């Protein structure tokens, strides 16, 4: 979708990707206590002429249309000039859904031998911006003193502690600013509100 939006090539090697391996039981408990879900999201956010592209675990507000998407379902949410937010979802993971997609591609190739698939974008690279400069509210997990965290990052909306960890939500900031604060944080996840 990022390529379609920009009309230019997005090299996957330039996309910042963080998987789910560092999510903990405490993160899940914090999400539940806040009425949120933890989701692995791929995002492409236009910032002027540049695009911030990244994959990362997110805390997703329960009221968000993406919150109930689970299991083998995949979803995409797009913001259109005339329609606002639109979400499309359906099976996209797991054995049957993947097998169906691969089989559909094979059938298409057999039915249309020699057919060339047109590409609607330029080979010119898209102008990507540093995803660590993307501004949002962030969830923090830490064992540091809450007052020290607030002194460095401003007001934080704290949740009830989980197994000796503090967890809370910052105001609007970016990963660069959080990193520049020099705090030893155990997790920093963006929030989709």
Task: Describe the function of each predicted region.
Residues 4-68, 73-75, 94:
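Substrate-binding/catalytic subdomain of NAD(P)-dependent oxidoreductase enzymes
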Residues 5-10, 16-22, 102, 159-172:
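Short, exposed beta-strand "edge-strand" segments with a Pro/Gly-rich flavor and a Y/T-containing core
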Residues 51-143:
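Catalytic, metal-anchored helix/loop core of enzyme active sites in primary metabolism
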Residues 106-193:
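A conserved regulatory-domain signal marking ACT and ACT-like small-molecule sensing domains
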